[in-house]
Amino acid sequence: MSSAAVAASRRQSCYLCDLPRMPWAMIWDFTEPVCRGCVNYEGADRIEFVIETARQLKRAHGFQEGRSPGPVGKPGKDMQSINHAEPGSRPPQPLDRYPLTSDRPPRLGAEYQRQANGIPVPNGFPKPDEPPELNRQSPNPRRTGAIPPNLVPLVNGSMPPVHALNGRSVQMGIPPGALAEHVGKRADDMKDKHRADSMSDPSDGHKRVDEWTQKGKTVREMMTLQTLDSRFKKEHAALPHRMSYESSSGALKTDRGKHSRGIKRKTSPEPDGEGIAVKLNGEGQPWLPSPSEVLKMPSAALPGFAAAPPSTISPHSRTTPPEAATAVQNSQSPMAALILAADNAGTGSPKDAGNQVHSTTTSAAGRRNSGSPQSPSAGQRRPALGATGTAHIPGMDPQAGHPHSIPDSSVPPSSVPLCCTLCHERLEDTHFVQCPSVPSHKFCFPCSRESIKQQGATGEVYCPSGEKCPLVGSNVPWAFMQGEIATILAGDVKVKKERDP
């Protein structure tokens, strides 16, 4: 590395980013001088590949690789050997450092390769009789045989087709007519011989010639490298998703009829409402006779439509058999099952909870309907519901003579409805008084207000149930705080019930 000390007083140009760097920011351990930023960005294991690709691009596009004056102290004999051509040939111009004209007849040796446009260019291997190639102000010569083994296929003929910039084919030393004929002939061959490991498509090169020339040198080099990685990463990543998704969707294509909406295939399938509707409404469930019956079903019975907007339900609309209701209950979310288990733990066994629900909803419905008789189908369905342990939601009440809306979506489907312990009225999910000791003690605001007035708002006011429920872990009964009493006794608080218009 003694040559590095000679050039230490001047800034060095990085081979990749083409920026002047201080000597301490340069790394001389590779075939070309590169800065630490490029090595960190590309990685030390891939930097040789990037350098070789940049070298190929610079030569193919005719970039001037040596801006600095020639190396100091080089004898004239060595300087003449750079232009090792016939004695009568002219010296090359700055852009013709690697002459591509007829001064040097194309050879088919290991150091030349034919590009897709028919232009023979050096492939990166130095000739034995050439002097060390100096790039910019690089103090070290390019080492012979430093190309990694994985670059041999790239160097020996798998480079992408190179297109002349701005159509400057005359500068390359080939007549336009011959170039057009040659390119046309090679275009047909490329359709058959196009390899999967080429870095860019010919059509992409034609489209982006203008964009390519407007971008900086470093951007052009990096874009060429990233074309290969990004394209194959996308295609290979999408392939297993596409195969598995289409194979799994083959079972859904049996006979959708008018339910199929032409769902577009995606590389990463996302759950959407239409796909769930097709599965639920398909022929795999024979107990759904027609789509009209599905429209009558309560949305709470379908897991995919738990948050559907409120709809009108007819009194004789429940067509779900008991076993299907049990399956729906088992397929709900863990949170809904947890809430249901907590409510059942407070009221006793699930069967007792079901009976309690039926009794409370019966009395509440009788009060709502002003003595209207219940439909005969209501009594027939109750034993089946009690046997399966499925909770009965008042929004699905068959004895209701007028339409009721579905309860708030925050209440999980098939959970025990909230009813006041004293008057058994339906409670709103957020506006009621909950006893902190007994989970089954739930009271509406009117009952709580009456209880507070009976106990006397000035003294200690205990649970509206009339019991002195002790706090958890102690024998001290809980009592209302003054702020809670004031809130409950406020006369302007009016909770809207379901029966209100």
From Swiss-Prot:
GO molecular function, a single term: DNA-binding transcription repressor activity, RNA polymerase II-specific
Main location: nucleus
Chain intervals for the UniProt region annotation (Cys-rich): 420-467
InterPro entries for this protein: I2BP1/2_C3HC4-RING_sf (IPR044882), Interferon_reg_fac2-bd1_2_Znf (IPR022750)
Zinc finger (RING-type): 420-467
GO BP field: negative regulation of macrophage differentiation; regulation of transcription by RNA polymerase II
Cellular component annotations (GO), alphabetically ordered: nucleus
Locations listed in the record: Nucleus
Described purpose of this protein according to its UniProt entry: Acts as a transcriptional repressor.
Assigned protein family: Belongs to the IRF2BP family.
Name used for this protein in its record: Interferon regulatory factor 2-binding protein 2-B
